[in-house]
């Protein structure tokens, strides 16, 4: 297996321009494909998850052209539901941001009835989709499970979404609601979506609503309990759509600056629509010096202390706090993060296991993780397993800010969101 060893870093300093956001890139491509008109999507992320979405759209008859560096995509919208030849199968890797929204969009009524199968890597078949399918069926959709009940692969007929009152469970993943919201304007009738349970990762819903608005569709949001969407609408191309830099990817660089130096990330700023920008507030609460601009966030080293916080609103970036916590004074508790368990891997167990390898004292709860700090000289050199999870690989690069090297197995798994991560991290790293 491939691996990379990072030697101890004495200081990090510099500026990094972030690649486009994964969540925004795949939403933008799907909305552009469903819209009337042609959309030029810029600062698109070039990564595995985006490639899976692009391949699926091509198979569904969507025409697009991609720039040589794959960051500009001009999409010719089909102006409504997709049409395809019966018997199509789409392989979506481990891309939740493609699987969930496409599951909903492919239920929309096509000009002639056809079936499509959505499948992916073995891990995708372990990632739940039941809450979304239950909701789609209430709206009249035809979706069947082909292997395990409640999980992909699924077979979908484009027999239409009728609208009406639909209840959806919001307690596991906000992607289910995002998928339903994005398909709802193209349903045959108005849809009233009621949330069952506590809606997790609310800021990701804000992203969805903001982007739908950019494509000409307004949703009535009643305090995140009920969402009302008029049916029989069309998305309209905004002609150009700029994808913000990935705020989750920013977290590693900001944390590095907070621990040992000064780092400025560009491509997101104080007006970003991504909830993960609020990661910087957590670093600030820990003692880092944070500066906000319209198009940048800068983190500078401060005396870090542990925090005890609910991080349900920033689940992806919260992982970075788990490794940063080792460099703080006092224990850190990250709470209300059950949905770590249904991501690329079970991130709660993975994080606890790998932190212990470097010498940390960790308590793993059902929906929380408690981490004790570690003196710089007491880190142990370990080989970190990454579980084919891009965020595990990136989080553990921070261990090199101690006095000990760290070895990361399968570093190329960062290709899911940030293929050049280790090169960029290296550019900011100074060694004595």
From Swiss-Prot:
InterPro entries assigned: Enolpyruvate_Tfrase_dom, Enolpyruvate_Tfrase_sf, EPSP_synthase, EPSP_synthase_CS, RNA3'P_cycl/enolpyr_Trfase_a/b
Residues that hold phosphoenolpyruvate according to the record: 22, 96, 127, 175, 347, 391, 416
Origin superkingdom: Bacteria
Coiled coil feature spans: none
Pfam family, one: EPSP_synthase
EC top class, as a word: transferase
GO biological-process terms attached to the record: amino acid biosynthetic process; aromatic amino acid family biosynthetic process; chorismate biosynthetic process
Pathway: Metabolic intermediate biosynthesis; chorismate biosynthesis; chorismate from D-erythrose 4-phosphate and phosphoenolpyruvate: step 6/7
SUPFAM superfamilies, alphabetized: EPT/RTPC-like
List of catalytic residues: 316 (proton acceptor)
Gene Ontology CC, one term: cytoplasm
Key words, A-Z: Amino-acid biosynthesis, Aromatic amino acid biosynthesis, Cytoplasm, Transferase
Protein family according to the UniProt entry: Belongs to the EPSP synthase family.
HAMAP family, per the entry: EPSP_synth (MF_00210)
Subunit architecture: Monomer.
PANTHER family with a match to the protein in the record: AROM/DEHYDROQUINATE SYNTHASE (PTHR21090), PENTAFUNCTIONAL AROM POLYPEPTIDE (PTHR21090:SF5)
The protein's role, per its UniProt record: Catalyzes the transfer of the enolpyruvyl moiety of phosphoenolpyruvate (PEP) to the 5-hydroxyl of shikimate-3-phosphate (S3P) to produce enolpyruvyl shikimate-3-phosphate and inorganic phosphate.
Designated name of the protein: 3-phosphoshikimate 1-carboxyvinyltransferase
Taxonomic lineage from the root: Bacteria, Pseudomonadati, Pseudomonadota, Gammaproteobacteria, Pasteurellales
